[in-house]
Amino acid sequence: MVLEKLKHVPDPTFVHQEPLAEFIANLFTAAGMRPNEARLCADVLVDADMNGIDTHGVCYNLDLHYLTGLMNGYINPTPNVKVTYETPGTAVIDADRGMAMIASVKAMELAIEKAKTTGIASVAVNNSSHYGAAGYYARLALKHDMIGYTMSSGGGRVIIPMNARYPWMGTNPMAFAA
């Protein structure tokens, strides 16, 4: 019976990138986000889909993580993203429970600026939401002829190592761009 249903899967519907990003940004704005930050988050989600990372794009994450989080109050729609610690080559950013995309882009932009002076830089983000597709942030460095490396310790302890009884590792996504 299940296989019979699979024989009649409808053809996919294709949507152009720009109208989709605009629609998603409007949804985020309606959920209380600032328009410029809503558009940034929409662009990150659409970019994931455009790069074949469906698990971190619009269809999988829009409702599951982001809109649900905004509507239920566990994602702050108007965060005060700020640097809480800084040295010439490092920094820590507090995302104020906001969308991780906002703080992650800010972190990479700050790392790029610091690396122009110091040669290498590292910026950490805390107090944020679902990280999204790591490759988006890493690729920001390419525009400045730099190598980008991003990672997250997100997801909590969900991986059970071999011969263990309980989960004690995260999925810890990472991306390189060179």
Where are the regions that the model predicts?
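Short glycine-rich or small-residue beta-strand-to-loop segments that form or flank ligand, phosphate
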Residues: 27, 92-96, 121-126
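Active-site cofactor/substrate anionic-group-binding motifs, chiefly glycine-
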Residues: 56-112
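Short, well-structured alpha-helical segments
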Residues: 35-46
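Generic N-terminal amphipathic, Lys/Arg-enriched alpha-helix
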Residues: 1-31
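Aromatic/hydrophobic pocket-lining residues that form π-stacking "cages" and hydrophobic walls in ligand
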Residues: 24, 111, 137
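Conserved catalytic cysteine-centered active-site region
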Residues: 110-123
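N-terminal and secondary-structure boundary signal
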Residues: 29-32, 49-54
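Glycine-rich anion/phosphate-binding loop at the beta-strand->alpha-helix junction
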Residues: 120-178
